[in-house]
């Protein structure tokens, strides 16, 4: 094939020089020696050694040329000690960077051992970073060691050159590294390849594969390495071509980059960096060749290490990592001779067409390292693809290179093309560890591509990407940041992790720590050396480095999405898994185009950034485009909700398509790309960057929160568009909910959303408050969580965003919840989104009033829940993604749940449970899922449902209280969080009392709802979990049932605290009632619970019936939207009804979600629940059921029911019993048939009757959408007809369980149904009782199991 000379050339060695030849010889000998030394490592030797050896050999060649090379050669492995000394800079710059590339391509192969060894050595110096990178990259250590080993020399001797080289290399990394590795690889290398080898990328890849054995394999390393002097002539041919192109660039670090890329580095890049491109095409051969490629990865690793070590080192490392990949050899020559020295000239000899941009970008970049890197990349790519320059370069090879390297703009397409292949491998690391950014790196590369894509192309394509251009500094920085900072630490691996995990604290997560740290460190340090060149510094430099973490967060969010995107591109399903983690954030960013844009901008710097402004409208539109007609309708209805929900859906559900466009906007990747490119993203993306940075754990929000807790301020600082993140994002995010968002986000923004707001749009901010509530402390990251989907929202924020999207008021919250949920089941979520839009609208006011407290709590929760949120988000996303699989969902849920629980407790309990709950519930879909009830909902899509549900505040709180109580029966945590959520006044006490009662309710509600919940909590979590995925559409149905169950639960919960029949009856769904004194008037209670004035009519049984009618459980879809809407309208207004409705809605969502799973659980639980309901309702005490969960609740329940009968709402109880008693007489089947339409009618009446502030038009439209969704759900249900029947059963059960409120006016239908259910229930009540303990145990087990899951950060990250 090609001799080592070729490899050297490709690596950037100027073989034309004699020293490079001898260098080649020396490095080859050295590499051969190293290979021999590491011969035992086999491929690892070949691969790991190959790139490392090449890096060393080329390093020596580049730096020491013969002397260093020979010295190194003398030291066969030398590994970085001699090499690092002499050729440390070169090796670090070029080969150390290249080996990381190689490692990127084959992290598990030789990389592992090699980097292990190297990492051991390297770890000494930069153990944390190294470890992080290793963790993030699984192969970073190999790079690390060489990099670090060389870092000493590099940093010391090569630091000057690094500084000089770094800008070029960095630019090359940005452009070349990301684009260069793909495009430079494609074009730069193609140029040499085409010029010298005339080989296409595929050919080049094959060449790599063929060559790799020679170059990196024992053949080249041993035979060719030593035997052959790397025939300079052969190398010279490509080198000449490359050098010809690069001679000046080499001077400017471009030619080194270019030639190295073309001959070896480019192939390496293609091989490794191109792993994105060729992905698994040449895993081993490529890894072999990836050896040289490894250096980029190594550079990334080094960057992450270097960021810690020193800005310069990191810059040089990053640049080296990327640029040196290509220009290691040339770089070495550059280092050796003055050729490389002139960075400015480097710009001048731009063989890339985007050079002008790059040049501009380079100038833009202070160090120009990043910009120059981009420029070189673009130059190289432009040289190869002159037209590709700004758009093409940024886009085409940007994607390809950016994917591999840092080119953000173009990697997306190329990434999709090439990255998919390799993304899976990287995805695996990425999936297992978000911060293992290799796959995420690629994912991030895509995102970075998008980011860097816009960034790098912004540098390179600043003209091309106007939208990005506005963020040029930010864009460039972001793109530069991801490639430079992210790629530096883990361009491939770290980059993504850094963005994805950058959220924790930049490198808060160990996984992404290297990147994040690198990024943060690099960010902090890079700004010095490469503040401008560093994308991060460039852009984050724009935004305070204090927000560096935010930027990191942004990157983190990007990373997360990138992970998802990368995964999506490589493995869409994998992406889905990742997406769910990402989904939360994408929801906001994508759903809330502005927010998400901010976050997504963060995530998809370029595409998203451009989308930034578009994203909300255009992205939503695009989201609608991708959405089904109903989804579109819903989106139109809810404004951004549909889009955000779509984002969620697409993010979680349609990761594949999205993946191409925006890693962050998985679903909307393509759409988002267009939108992203529209230019809204510059600010938003940056805003989201901060948000997104913590998006995994929602540190972004948190980080943003510090500076940008005001919604826009920090974000504004971050980006212009972010200036009014809450209002602007909310508004932009959801034109529809803009007003609401503005209202709500204003308060919320400032309080809880201030961080979220900055993080994402107001919708998210609203939702982010909810979502960010957990992440609010990590508000910056929260929206990152939420909008960047807040990725943090990812757990909750995204959900919230989605939730918020349906309605302006609801948008924020709902968007998040929805986003998360959407992926699981779009229809129910759509409906829920609309319903939540209503709820949000209604709750918006409530939240407006409680926004401050809510924000406060949101902040609190955010703080408490940053990781939890992330986990919850991941979990939620997992629920969304894995919601399809019960286990996954169950596992994710619990993980989220436990984390959420404390958050919920702290934030939600503290904040007005209601407003906070509302917010959090959307955002706390994550928290909710953590809550067993939440989990269920989330599992079944209920959490997002809950989130999406505007009523989530009361309802979710109720459900959280009830569900939480249900789960509390299984686990105290849920109670806490239920109490937090459910209790305005009865924070934990109520919850805990509710907990005993919940156990009782677990029998009663659990028998009915919790029976479905505890009994079915397990089935739902497991059985239902499985069904939930399938039954997500049924979640509306379940939602109906959830209404019953929620009401029941509210009853149970309410009784838990208040144990007052009034609560059970009056506010079945009003968990708050528990805390409320029984004497408190319904209206007062409603006002207190809802935090808004409630019309008395709303509180009346009729209104409750609206809430109950929402239980048109068979009509979960239509009913749910309307019921929830109506419920929202009526329920938010009346504390009691809203409470009941909300709880019922949440429960319905929950139960609806559980419903489909409940169909599993309903099958066991439907009887159980009706029986339990009968027991609780007919018997007035969940005696039979009660004993199952906990005897002590039985008294409570007994008392509760007695109170229900006697104490507080005798009328309700009377009605309840009437309905319960009457139910049997009513034709259950007829009622069932009629319940959907009837419920819809009821809801329509209700919605129209007390105009709960919901737009009548909107309500009508929502009803329409609901009908469509219901049809869809029914279609789903047709497949699940049994589930449907059981759903009705569950509805009946729910009615029986929630007789008071549910059986109210609308209870007739429900009561009839309930009667049917009750009759069935009586039959199976004994069975239910018998089953219930097991179910309860199951639930407890589930909770216990979930708890660990919810706390399992590894899993969250992994997912």
Swiss-Prot record:
Quote the biased-composition stretches of kind Pro residues, using this chain's numbering: 335-353
Q: Where is the composition biased (Basic and acidic residues)?
A: 15-28, 120-135, 591-613, 868-880, 1324-1342
Pfam families recorded: JCAD
Q: Where is this region: Disordered?
A: 1-147, 249-411, 454-554, 591-813, 840-1076, 1105-1141, 1157-1207, 1225-1260, 1276-1359
Q: According to its UniProt record, where is this protein located?
A: Cell junction, Adherens junction
Any one annotated GO CC term: ruffle membrane
Extent of Low complexity compositional bias? 302-321, 849-859
Keywords in alphabetical order: Cell adhesion, Cell junction, Phosphoprotein
Keyword Membrane applies: no
- A GO BP annotation: positive regulation of blood vessel endothelial cell proliferation involved in sprouting angiogenesis
Question: InterPro entries annotated for this entry?
Answer: JCAD
- Annotated positions of the Phosphoserine modification: 1044, 1050, 1194, 1281
Q: Where is the composition biased (Polar residues)?
A: 82-91, 98-112, 539-554, 619-632, 689-704, 756-773, 1003-1013
Q: What PANTHER family does the database record attribute to this sequence?
A: JUNCTIONAL CADHERIN 5-ASSOCIATED PROTEIN (PTHR34757:SF1), JUNCTIONAL PROTEIN ASSOCIATED WITH CORONARY ARTERY DISEASE (PTHR34757)
Q: What is this protein called?
A: Junctional cadherin 5-associated protein
Organism of provenance? Homo sapiens
């Amino acid at each position: 094939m090609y001799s080592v000379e070729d490899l050297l050339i490709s690596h950037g060695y100027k073989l034309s020089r004699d020293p490079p030849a001898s260098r080649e010889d020396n490095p080859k000998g050295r590499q051969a020696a190293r290979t021999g030394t590491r011969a035992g490592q086999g491929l690892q030797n070949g691969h790991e050694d190959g790139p490392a050896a090449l890096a060393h050999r080329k390093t020596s060649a580049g730096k020491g040329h013969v002397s260093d090379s020979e010295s190194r050669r003398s030291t066969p492995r030398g590994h970085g000690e001699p090499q690092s000394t002499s050729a440390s800079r070169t090796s670090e710059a070029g080969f150390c960077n290249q080996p990381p590339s190689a490692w990127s391509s084959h992290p598990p192969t030789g990389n592992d051992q090699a980097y292990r060894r190297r990492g051991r050595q390297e770890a000494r110096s930069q153990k944390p970073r190294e470890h992080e990178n290793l963790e993030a990259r699984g192969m970073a250590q190999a790079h690390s060691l060489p990099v670090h080993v060389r870092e000493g020399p590099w940093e010391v001797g090569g630091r000057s050159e690094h500084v000089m080289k770094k800008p070029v290399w960095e630019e090359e990394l940005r452009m070349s590294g990301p684009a260069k590795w793909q495009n430079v690889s494609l074009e730069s290398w193609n140029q040499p390849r085409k010029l010298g080898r005339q080989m296409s990328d595929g050919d080049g890849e094959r060449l790599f594969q063929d060559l790799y054995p020679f170059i990196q394999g024992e053949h080249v390393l041993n035979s060719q390495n030593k035997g052959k002097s790397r025939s300079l002539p052969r190398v010279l041919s490509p080198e000449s071509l490359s050098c010809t192109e690069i001679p000046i660039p080499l001077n400017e670090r471009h030619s080194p980059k270019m030639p190295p890329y073309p001959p070896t580095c480019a192939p390496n890049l293609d091989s490794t960096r191109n792993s994105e491109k060729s992905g698994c095409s040449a895993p081993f051969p490529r890894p072999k060749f990836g050896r040289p490629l490894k250096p980029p990865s190594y550079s990334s690793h080094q960057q992450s290490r270097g960021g810690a070590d020193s800005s310069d080192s990191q810059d040089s490392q990053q640049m080296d990592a990327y640029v040196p990949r290509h220009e290691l050899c040339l770089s070495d020559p550059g280092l050796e001779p003055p050729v490389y020295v002139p960075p400015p000239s480097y710009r001048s000899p731009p063989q890339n067409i985007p050079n002008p941009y790059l040049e501009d970008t380079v100038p833009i970049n202070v160090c120009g390292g990043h910009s120059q890197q981009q420029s070189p990349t673009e130059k190289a790519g432009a040289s190869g693809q002159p037209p590709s320059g700004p758009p093409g370069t940024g886009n085409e090879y940007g994607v390809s290179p950016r994917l591999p390297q840092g080119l953000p703009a173009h990697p997306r397409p190329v990434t999709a093309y090439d990255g998919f292949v390799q993304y899976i491998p990287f995805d695996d690391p990425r999936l297992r560890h978000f911060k293992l950014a290799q796959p995420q790196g690629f994912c991030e590369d895509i995102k970075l591509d998008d980011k860097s894509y816009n960034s790098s192309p912004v540098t390179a394509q600043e003209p091309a990407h106007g939208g990005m251009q506005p963020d040029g500094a930010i864009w460039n920085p972001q793109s530069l940041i991801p490639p430079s900072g992210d790629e530096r630490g883990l361009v491939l691996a770290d980059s993504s992790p850094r963005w994805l995990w950058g959220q924790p604290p930049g490198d808060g997560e160990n996984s992404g720590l290297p990147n994040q740290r690198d990024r943060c460190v690099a960010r902090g340090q890079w700004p010095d050396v490469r503040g401008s060149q560093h994308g991060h510094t460039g852009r984050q430099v724009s935004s305070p480095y204090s927000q560096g973490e935010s930027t990191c967060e942004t990157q983190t969010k990007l990373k997360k999405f990138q992970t998802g995107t990368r995964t999506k591109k490589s493995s869409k399903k994998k992406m889905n898994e990742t997406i769910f983690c990402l989904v939360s954030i994408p929801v906001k960013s994508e759903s809330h185009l502005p927010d998400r844009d901010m976050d997504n901008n963060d995530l998809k710097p370029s595409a998203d950034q451009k989308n930034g402004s578009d994203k909300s409208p255009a992205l939503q539109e695009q989201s609608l485009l991708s959405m089904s007609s109903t989804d579109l309708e819903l989106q139109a209805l809810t404004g951004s909700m549909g889009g955000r929900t779509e984002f969620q859906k697409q993010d979680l559900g349609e990761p594949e398509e999205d993946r191409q466009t925006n890693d962050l906007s998985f679903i909307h990747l393509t759409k988002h790309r267009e939108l992203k490119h529209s230019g809204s993203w510059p600010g938003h993306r940056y805003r989201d960057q901060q948000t997104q940075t913590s998006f995994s754990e929602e540190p972004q929000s948190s980080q943003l929160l510090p500076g940008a807790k005001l919604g826009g301020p920090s974000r504004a600082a971050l980006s212009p568009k972010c200036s009014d993140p809450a209002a602007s994002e909310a508004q932009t995010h959801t034109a529809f909910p803009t007003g609401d968002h503005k209202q709500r986000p204003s308060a919320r923004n400032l309080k809880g959303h201030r961080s979220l707001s900055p993080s994402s749009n107001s919708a998210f901010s609203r939702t982010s408050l909810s979502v960010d509530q957990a992440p609010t402390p990590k508000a910056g990251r929260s929206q990152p969580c939420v909008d960047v989907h807040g990725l943090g929202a990812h757990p909750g924020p995204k959900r919230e965003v989605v939730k918020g999207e349906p309605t302006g008021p609801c948008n924020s919250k709902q968007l998040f919840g929805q986003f998360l949920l959407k992926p699981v089941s779009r229809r129910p979520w759509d409906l829920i989104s609309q319903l939540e839009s209503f709820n949000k609208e209604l709750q918006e006011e409530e939240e407006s009033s409680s926004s401050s407290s809510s924000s406060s709590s949101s902040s609190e929760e955010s703080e408490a829940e940053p990781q939890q949120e992330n986990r919850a988000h991941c979990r939620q996303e997992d629920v969304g993604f894995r919601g399809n699989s019960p286990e996954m969902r169950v596992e994710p849920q619990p993980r989220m749940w436990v984390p959420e629980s404390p958050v919920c407790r702290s934030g939600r309990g503290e904040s007005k449970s209601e407003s906070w709950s509302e917010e959090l519930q959307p955002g706390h879909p994550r928290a909710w899922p953590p809550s067993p009830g939440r989990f269920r909902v989330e599992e079944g899509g209920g959490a997002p449902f809950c989130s999406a549900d505007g009523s989530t505040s009361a309802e979710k709180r109720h459900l959280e209280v009830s569900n939480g109580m249900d789960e509390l029966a299984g686990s105290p945590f849920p109670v806490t969080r239920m109490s937090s959520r459910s209790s305005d006044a009865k924070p934990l006490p109520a919850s805990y009392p509710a907990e005993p009662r919940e156990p009782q309710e677990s029998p009663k509600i659990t028998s009915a709802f919790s029976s479905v919940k505890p009994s079915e909590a397990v089935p739902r979590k497991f059985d239902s979990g499985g069904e939930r995925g399938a039954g997500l559409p049924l979640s509306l149905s379940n939602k109906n049932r959830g209404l019953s169950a929620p009401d029941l639960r509210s009853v149970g919960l309410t009784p838990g605290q208040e144990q007052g029949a009034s609560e059970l009856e009056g506010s079945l769904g009003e968990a708050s009632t528990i805390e409320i004194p029984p004497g408190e008037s319904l209206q007062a209670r409603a006002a207190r619970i809802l935090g808004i004035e409630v019309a008395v009519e709303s509180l009346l049984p009729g209104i409750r019936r609206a809430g109950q009618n929402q239980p048109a459980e068979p009509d979960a879809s239509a009913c749910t939207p309307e019921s929830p809407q109506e419920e929202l309208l009526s329920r938010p207004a009346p504390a009691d009804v809203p409470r009941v409705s909300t709880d019922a809605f949440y429960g319905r969502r929950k139960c609806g979600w559980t419903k489909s799973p409940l169909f599993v659980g309903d099958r066991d639980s439907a009887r159980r629940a009706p029986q339990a309901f009968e027991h609780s309702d007919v018997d007035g005490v969940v005696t039979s059921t009660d004993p199952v969960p906990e005897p002590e609740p039985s008294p409570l329940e007994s008392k509760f029911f007695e109170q229900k009968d006697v104490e507080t709402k005798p009328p309700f109880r009377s009605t309840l019993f009437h309905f319960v008693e009457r139910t049997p007489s009513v034709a259950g089947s007829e009622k069932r048939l009629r319940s959907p339409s009837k419920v819809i009618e009821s809801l329509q009446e209700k919605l129209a009757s007390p105009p709960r502030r919901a737009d009548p038009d909107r309500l009508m439209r929502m009803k329409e959408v609901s009908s469509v969704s219901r049809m869809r759900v029914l279609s789903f249900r047709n497949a699940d007809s049994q589930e449907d029947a059981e759903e009705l059963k569950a509805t009946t059960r729910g009615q029986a369980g929630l007789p008071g409120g549910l059986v109210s006016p609308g209870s007739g239908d429900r009561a009839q149904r309930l009667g049917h259910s009750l009759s069935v229930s009586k039959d199976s009540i004994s069975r239910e009782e018998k089953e219930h303990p097991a179910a309860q145990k199951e639930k407890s087990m589930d909770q216990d199991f979930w708890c660990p899951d919810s706390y399992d950060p590894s899993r969250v990250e992994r997912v």
